[in-house]
Swiss-Prot record:
Family note: Belongs to the universal ribosomal protein uL10 family.
NCBIfam families: PRK00099.1-1 (NF000955)
SUBUNIT field: Part of the ribosomal stalk of the 50S ribosomal subunit. The N-terminus interacts with L11 and the large rRNA to form the base of the stalk. The C-terminus forms an elongated spine to which L12 dimers bind in a sequential fashion forming a multimeric L10(L12)X complex.
Record organism: Desulfotalea psychrophila (strain LSv54 / DSM 12343)
Gene Ontology biological-process entries: translation
Keywords: Ribonucleoprotein, Ribosomal protein, RNA-binding, rRNA-binding
Origin superkingdom: Bacteria
Protein name: Large ribosomal subunit protein uL10
UniProt-listed InterPro entries: Ribosomal_uL10 (IPR001790), Ribosomal_uL10-like_sf (IPR043141), Ribosomal_uL10_bac (IPR022973), Ribosomal_uL10_bac_type (IPR047865)
Length: 175
């Protein structure tokens, strides 16, 4: 790889790191190519990607981005996973993959520029996705007006039932 290729790669990585909401550093030593392809496909489905490059190039690319807090973890065989939208999906994919593959070890992560540990990444993976949370919020908002309408319609309904009972009572007295 010549100097121009390295500069182009650093530029691409810098752009990726700058747009990333979630960045994860993992050790992939000993994984088969087919296993890397598997996680690459799974990550692509949730607007994320996994990149492998030399650690010095990763450090240069991380400068000035939210991923810079992870620069100390760029040692050994390093893969960097970047997510550009909802961080929950990639966190789920990575924790499930790491659970099934001993040789894939998550070192650390950065969520919007703040370094988080593996335990917080696993907690993030347990959250429902953004779409599910929005659905739950919408359901809650929908239930409030519905309940209010039921309460408000209960008063006239009770009044009408009372009038009907009074009418029935008068009719029975008249017989």
């Amino acid at each position: 790889m010549n100097r121009d290729d390295k500069a182009a790669l650093v530029s691409q990585l810098n752009d990726s790191f700058g747009r990333a909401k979630l960045s994860v550093v993992a050790d992939y030593c000993g994984l088969k190519v087919s296993e890397l392809q598997q996680i690459r496909i799974e990550l692509k489905g949730c607007d994320s990607e996994i990149r492998v490059a030399k650690n010095t190039l990763l450090k240069r690319a991380a400068d000035g981005t939210g991923t810079a807090v992870l620069a100390d973890d760029f040692t050994g065989t390093t893969a960097v996973i970047t997510s550009y939208s909802d961080p929950v999906g990639p966190a789920k994919v990575l924790t499930q993959f790491a659970g099934g593959h001993e040789k894939f070890v998550i070192r650390s992560a950065a969520l919007e520029g703040e370094k988080i540990g593996v335990d917080r990444l696993e907690a993030l993976a347990k959250l429902p996705s953004r779409e599910v949370l929005l659905g739950q919020l919408l359901s809650t908002w929908n239930n409030v007006p519905t309940g209010l309408v039921r309460v408000l319609s209960g008063v006239p309904r009770t009044f009408v039932y009372g009038l009907q009972a009074l009418k029935d009572q008068k009719e029975q007295e008249g017989k």
